[in-house]
Amino acid sequence: MANVVLLYSPSCSACPSAKRLFKELRVKYSFNYREVDITTPDGQELADRHSVRAVPATIINGRLTFIGVPSRQSAEKALAPRPT
């Protein structure tokens, strides 16, 4: 199961769209999801660790995957189960 962390800022105008997208995708794909405010100590630490300089930023399985709001197609591709 994928682990998705969405870094956001309360003042970010695009962040609600990214939040909505990942909440909708949880219906189709099973993944752990967490939203982290970059103005908090936890958010600042994650942003520093992944060199995030803009939000929204999406970390999937510990890897910075998207900066900005991804297209639905790109997000689905990143979340789709990989064949084993």
Predicted regions and their residues:
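Local sequence-structure signature of Cys/Sec-based thiol-disulfide redox active-site neighborhoods
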Residues: M1-K28
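Structural micro-motif
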Residues: H50-I59
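Short polar/charged helix/loop
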Residues: V27-Y29, E45-L46
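Thiol-based oxidoreductase modules, predominantly thioredoxin-like and allied folds used
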Residues: F31-G43
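Short alpha-helical
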Residues: S13-A14, P41-D42, Q73
